[in-house]
């Protein structure tokens, strides 16, 4: 059971890794404004 919470942590870490990709275009648009 202790291993379950440990596996749940790496999952959220992978999601944020994909967020930076869409966040880049937003930062570029902000600079254009």
Swiss-Prot record:
Keywords: Amphibian defense peptide, Pharmaceutical, Secreted. One of its GO terms (biological process) is defense response. It is found in: Secreted. Expressed by the skin glands. RP-33 is present in skin secretions in higher concentration than RP-27. RP-33 may be a precursor of RP-27 that is activated in the skin in response to an appropriate stimulus. Changing residue 8 to W: In [A8W]RP-27; loss of stimulation of insulin release, increase of TNF-alpha and IL-1beta production effect on mouse peritoneal cells, and decrease of IL-10 production effect. It comes from Rhinophrynus dorsalis. One of its GO terms (cellular component) is extracellular region. This is Rhinophrynin-33. It comes from the Eukaryota.
């Amino acid at each position: 059971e202790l291993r379950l919470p440990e596996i749940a942590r790496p999952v959220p870490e992978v999601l944020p890794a994909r967020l930076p990709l869409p966040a880049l275009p937003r930062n570029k648009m902000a600079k254009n404004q």
